């Protein structure tokens, strides 16, 4: 077993703090409307330019293993916030850094780390409740547009295009972001359907850069049973191969010999094919297969109605303009189904919703209705260069996550104001001992850090602005974009409650673990093996004369 290096107490925490600060200092320069860019060197291609906190965090690895542990723990904060709400990564990082820095000062002054952590946790629970009380539900398009604008680093065109997309396909509709061909952003709304089933084998993937299967103008075979015998598919595969089009198979399952043969055919380029499981279970699966059949003008091959898979023809197959399959989802775009048939199917589902007495059934029927009637919105990003395109695409995806979060839990005043107000709401909170109360104060001070950082990135004096905001009430705050004070909601500076809440919770969770760390263990650096000694000349061989 390799030797280990161990650090204890203050030595460990000092190293860890150094790593935390390196990562957080790189991330926090991106915060706010006047946040700066970070340029990241890549081992191949040109550098990446970004204002996205989690992208910056993911790139940072430090030489010193103890410092790197601190950096990786803060990276976890950014990743968790990104996974939960899709935004708020920089805010979460700033909060974590502030809690760790303030907390370690208190520990150095002799306070109990466990009580300090309990105080921080108590403050966060109370602050989350205060945030929820201050939250305003998002009901109109204007609010959605404002949230999108803020999340895309104050890019109004992004806010507008997301609001329009949500208006077209509904808040629960499918919205995808693609790289466009023009210089300006475009929005396409196409009839489509998404369901939660991914490819059955990663060998079907044909877009390695994003790990998806993309099929253009495919035939779609719908089968209401498990397929394990390849002989059942041979007729269909031969007909599709002759047509030169790709094939998507949606069945209860495709396994064994059948799946292996499909993979081999796909890899050899004989026929471009992919297979996914049908969505749902039991009767719901049958109904959803029928929905796909209506959308794509296909027929569900079902033995219940006397159809055999071996006898399926091209006429039984559905068709669509495009299919995109990821690890977990399948999107069928622009099926060739007749509009009248789709409308009839939609009316039928609406009737079932009205007749149903079960809330669960109603919810599932509503989902089917959204898939059939909603369609898919595609936002095509326009930019002058590839570097700008990548940076902008990441921002739009962030903004899309944020607007969904806003619709889910509502919005609060942006610009760090909501956290300042939450801190004021809990200022009289006390712990069961002095150290816990100090932990509460650590959290309260840390909740001012995002506002301070936004102001610092603008080049203004953070303490002066914070004092002015504290003296106000409600949504009164500082608009860092134009250096004015006023009602943040009225000025359109909003943050989704879910983003602010999850940033605070994840920051406190990971920071609490760091504060209660007493030892750190890592592999000791290994000395390179010494070179073999020089053997020199083989002396002493003289005096061997006279040998015949």
Curated annotation (Swiss-Prot):
ATP binds at residues 30-33, 51, 87-91, 415, 495. SUPFAM superfamilies: GroEL apical domain-like (SSF52029), GroEL equatorial domain-like (SSF48592), GroEL-intermediate domain like (SSF54849). It catalyses: ATP + H2O + a folded polypeptide = ADP + phosphate + an unfolded polypeptide. InterPro entries: Chaperonin_Cpn60_CS, Cpn60/GroEL, Cpn60/GroEL/TCP-1, GroEL-like_apical_dom_sf, GROEL-like_equatorial_sf, TCP-1-like_intermed_sf. Keywords: ATP-binding, Chaperone, Cytoplasm, Isomerase, Nucleotide-binding. Its EC number is 5.6.1.7. Its main location: cytoplasm. Coiled coil: none annotated. GO terms for biological process: protein refolding. GO terms for molecular function: ATP binding; ATP-dependent protein folding chaperone; isomerase activity; unfolded protein binding. It is an enzyme of class 5 (isomerase). Pfam families: Cpn60_TCP1 (PF00118). It is found in: Cytoplasm. It comes from the Bacteria. GO terms for cellular component: cytoplasm. HAMAP family: CH60. Together with its co-chaperonin GroES, plays an essential role in assisting protein folding. The GroEL-GroES system forms a nano-cage that allows encapsulation of the non-native substrate proteins and provides a physical environment optimized to promote and accelerate protein folding. Forms a cylinder of 14 subunits composed of two heptameric rings stacked back-to-back. Interacts with the co-chaperonin GroES. Belongs to the chaperonin (HSP60) family. This is Chaperonin GroEL. It comes from Colwellia psychrerythraea (strain 34H / ATCC BAA-681).
């Amino acid at each position: 077993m390799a030797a280990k290096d161990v650090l204890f107490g203050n030595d460990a925490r000092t190293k860890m703090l150094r790593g935390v600060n390196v990562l957080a200092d790189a991330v926090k320069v991106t915060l706010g409307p006047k946040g700066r860019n970070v340029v990241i060197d890549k081992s191949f291609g040109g550098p990446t330019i970004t204002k996205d906190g989690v992208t910056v965090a993911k790139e940072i690895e430090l030489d010193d293993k103890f410092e790197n542990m601190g950096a990786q723990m803060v990276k976890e904060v950014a990743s968790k916030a990104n996974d939960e709400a899709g935004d708020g990564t920089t805010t979460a990082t700033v909060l974590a850094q502030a809690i760790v820095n303030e907390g370690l000062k208190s520990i150095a002054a002799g306070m109990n780390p466990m009580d300090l952590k309990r105080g921080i946790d108590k403050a966060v629970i109370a602050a989350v409740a205060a945030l929820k009380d201050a939250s305003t539900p998002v009901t109109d398009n204007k609010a959605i547009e404002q949230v999108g604008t803020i999340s895309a680093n104050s890019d109004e065109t992004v806010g507008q295009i997301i609001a329009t997309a949500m208006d077209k396909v509904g808040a629960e509709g499918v919205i995808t972001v693609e790289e466009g061909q023009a210089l300006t952003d475009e929005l396409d709304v196409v009839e489509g359907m998404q369901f939660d089933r991914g490819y059955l084998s990663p060998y079907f993937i044909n877009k390695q850069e994003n790990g998806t299967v993309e099929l253009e103008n495919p035939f779609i075979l719908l089968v209401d049973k498990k397929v394990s015998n390849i002989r059942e598919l041979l007729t269909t595969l031969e007909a599709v191969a002759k047509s030169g089009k790709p094939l998507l198979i949606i069945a209860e399952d495709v396994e064994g010999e059948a799946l292996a043969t499909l993979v081999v055919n796909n890899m050899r380029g004989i026929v471009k094919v992919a297979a996914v499981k049908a969505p749902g279970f039991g009767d719901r699966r049958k109904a959803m297969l029928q929905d796909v059949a209506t959308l794509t003008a296909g027929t569900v091959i079902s033995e219940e109605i006397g159809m055999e898979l071996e006898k399926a023809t091209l006429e039984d197959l559905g068709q669509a303009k495009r299919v995109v399959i990821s690890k977990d989802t399948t999107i069928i775009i622009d099926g060739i189904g007749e509009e009248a048939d789709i409308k009839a199917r939609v009316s039928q589902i609406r009737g079932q919703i009205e007749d149903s007495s079960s809330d669960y059934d109603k919810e599932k029927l509503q989902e089917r209705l959204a898939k059939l009637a909603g369609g898919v919105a595609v936002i095509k990003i326009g930019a002058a260069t590839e570097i700008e395109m990548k940076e902008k695409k990441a921002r739009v995806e962030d903004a899309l996550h944020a607007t969904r979060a806003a619709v889910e839990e509502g919005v609060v005043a942006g610009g760090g104001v909501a956290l300042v107000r939450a801190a004021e709401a809990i200022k009289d909170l006390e712990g069961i001992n002095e150290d816990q109360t100090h932990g509460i104060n650590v959290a309260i001070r840390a909740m001012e850090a995002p506002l301070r950082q936004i102001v610092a990135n603008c080049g203004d004096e953070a303490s002066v602005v914070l004092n002015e905001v504290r003296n106000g009430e409600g949504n009164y705050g500082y608009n860092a974009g134009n250096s004015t004070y006023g009602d943040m909601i009225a000025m359109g500076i909003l943050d989704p409650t879910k983003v602010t809440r999850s940033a605070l919770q994840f920051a406190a969770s990971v920071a609490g673990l760091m504060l209660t760390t007493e030892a750190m263990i890592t592999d000791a650096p290994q000395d390179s093996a010494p070179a073999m000694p020089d053997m020199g000349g083989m002396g002493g061989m003289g005096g061997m004369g006279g040998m015949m």
